[in-house]
Regions:
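N-terminal pro-sequences and low-complexity stem/linker regions of secreted or lumenal proteins
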Residues: 1-173
């Protein structure tokens, strides 16, 4: 672990935006590595940034945040990012996409290893995190048994998916 804002290190200001980390169902399990918690750098595309932290005490609202912010005390009920965890928080269930293998969502079905918890790597995936981020056969939003475990966009607007060119503006492409 290292301080991102350490004057003797990277010295990145608190105002400098950094990239987001991978918050996905299978990668989260691969990062946790059976409870060893030693693969966070290996299964991300952010490299060692996952090991960095800021000295939050320099923030003007630090005293308030220390007392009233949950921060790391959100105990997620499911692996991965906020999509699945928000749904799980409300209903303790995982959304399903019935018959996904015969639907337009078929390309978003993840390809996993026989262990069922790790994504299958391509033949040209780097052997080490030092050589680059892993490459997956299919890092999909759906499990092979059609559970929706990563962020999916609605088929209508508003959506992160823009409408199809020349199509109905009420729908996503």
């Amino acid at each position: 672990p290292f301080a991102i804002d350490d004057p003797n290190g990277f010295n990145a200001s608190l105002s400098v935006p950094t990239r987001d980390f991978v918050h996905r169902f299978y990668q989260n399990q691969m990062q946790i590595d059976g409870g060893r918690n030693d693969k966070f750098v290996a299964y991300t595309d952010a490299g060692a940034l996952t090991m960095g932290h800021y000295d939050g005490s320099k923030l003007p609202m630090w005293p308030i945040a220390r007392e009233f912010t949950l921060a790391d005390h959100f105990f997620m009920g499911a692996f991965g990012g906020s999509f699945l965890n928000h749904i799980y928080l409300i209903c303790a269930c995982i959304p399903q996409y019935p018959h996904a293998d015969t639907s337009p969502a078929k390309p978003t079905i993840a390809v996993v290893n026989p262990d069922g918890v790790s994504l299958a790597l391509t033949d040209n995936s780097p052997a080490s995190a030092i050589d680059g981020p892993p490459k997956y056969v299919s890092d999909g939003n759906l499990t092979p048994d059609f559970y929706a475990v990563n962020t999916m966009q609605p088929p209508y607007q508003p959506s992160q998916n823009a409408p199809a060119p020349g199509g109905d503006p009420a729908y996503s492409d």
